[in-house]
Amino acid sequence: MKHSASESKPLSSGLAIYRRLLRYGFPYWRSFCVAVVAMIAYAAITPFFAKLIQPLIDGSFIDNDPTVLRQVSLMLIGLSVLRGIAGFLSEYCSGSVGRRVIADLRRDIFDQLLNLPCSFYDNASGGQLLSKLLYNTEQVSASLQQGIITCIREGFTVIGLMALMVYQNPVLSLVFLVLGPVLGLSVRFVSKRFRRLSMRIQESMGKVSHVTQEVIDAQRIVKVFNGKDYEAAKFATENDRNQKRQMKLIATDALGGGVIHLISVAGVAGILYVVSLDSVRQTITPGSLMAFIAAMAMMLSPIRRLSQVVSVMQRGIAAGDSIFAMLDLPRERDRGRISLKRARGSIEYRHVSLVYDDRHGAAVDDVSLVIPAGKTVALVGQSGSGKTSLVRLLPRLYEATAGEILIDGHDIRELTLESLRRQIAYVGQEVTLFNDTVASNIAYGCLDRVGLDAVREAARAANALDFIETLPQGFDTLVGQQGIVLSGGQRQRIAIARALLKNAPILILDEATSALDAESERYVQQALEVLMQNRTTLVIAHRLSTIQNADQICVMRGGRIIECGTHAQLMAARGGYADLYAMQFGYSSVPEAVAVHAVRR
């Protein structure tokens, strides 16, 4: 995925992204406020530890007052308890906000994935999307949680210690304050580099996830084709690229932290040099000097943590930029106002065209077709002729570039997506099953509306009940990812049972029997005949033997319908359909195929 645009954005865009991330924490403002108050309390208590050094030295050792030592001891215990409580509250409450933000972000990302159009997934990487959902959200949480804790708690600690230093000796404090602009420039440089590197790391993490997911999904192909070495090399390349980018980030973090620490130590050294001057040394007591030096020493650690939090915050901003870029993508258009309860099933395509990409020609080119309710229409043609593209337009998986499609006289764009898709059932060549029970897969989409009796009846009608009852847990058997524990024919019958249970008036069959053996095809074909009864059916077929009884057969070529008719009419016409028939059944010529066909009739 490309990030060049985001990498060149000004710093203000990073602030805008961070503000948008912070809005995810607004619903949990009570916990956030408790965390902020606890952080400020923690920071306010810290300077008192340095301040106590002055009475400890001046009172106990200079003035020889033992009561001061006892008082300081009690105060140290009290301050430690208070700071411990404040530290716990700040960590717990900010952690609570951070985890809730992650949950909300993941919910929004998943909801967006469910509502993005199919065209988005045509060019999207599954690994990249998974990386956004898992890795990027963790980066955002770390940015919010650690970033806020460090900025508020350590920031106020530095302010408190600096105030103590100014109170103890304003002149010496000026030496330390002079280094402020130098620290600011260092942090600015480091933050810009962190953001660039973080974006590249997130991109490479997505590629690592993508390669891994591909190997898991295609592990049988990898084994059969001895692709282990190739896949290992591909993974090693992406993994090594990610590791190198991580090392650049670590180097930048270490170098930036070291430089900032060096600048801070230089300030301390400068102050010690100034204190060595007689004119200054005579104006300060030993206790006051030690309190001042203690405040400086205690300030170094918060300053270092503040410099290191830049990396966390920039990673979070880069992750947020990537997440929001996806969340801002347009969703499927659902502007229809008509909710169709149950269609009769008549379908009409009027001069419909579809262009996936302007660089290529039309996948569907000015197609007009009328399908009466309850009729079966088969679409045939060579691969790439536009059959599947034409059918994909019906449930609005893709939007037609031109023309209109009507169901029962209603333009499908005027129907709500939910009611449109409620009218359509689908059975394809590649059956999609979820890693759930057989019953849940059959009842998918209507789990809350049907009982087991309805599921059993659908399975019986789909010729699936016999094999389901032989499974270890029957309908409660887990089918595995993509139904891996079932055969191809069994998966197909589960898909048919799912379509039967949906009981939609329109049915799409996409090469539903092309990958089956003869026995499985017989069972599936019987189930399909039951499924097609009293339904408007669109059949995409390569095997012409399966669609000869269709009410109408349409031959497609180059995105257009070149001829339509019954099997007998098209054979008699000796056109494109007869060519396909002769080729598929091994006849030497169309006339021979037509002659044999006439004799068989």
From Swiss-Prot:
Reactions the enzyme catalyzes: ATP + H2O + lipid A-core oligosaccharideSide 1 = ADP + phosphate + lipid A-core oligosaccharideSide 2
Domain ABC transmembrane type-1: 34-315
Record's subcellular location: Cell inner membrane
One Pfam family recorded for the sequence: ABC_tran
Record's keyword terms, sorted: ATP-binding, Cell inner membrane, Cell membrane, Lipid transport, Membrane, Nucleotide-binding, Translocase, Transmembrane, Transmembrane helix, Transport
Class of the enzyme per the UniProt entry, highest EC level: translocase
Domain ABC transporter: from-to ranges: 347-583
GO CC entries: plasma membrane
Family membership: Belongs to the ABC transporter superfamily. Lipid exporter (TC 3.A.1.106) family.
Name the record gives this protein: ATP-dependent lipid A-core flippase
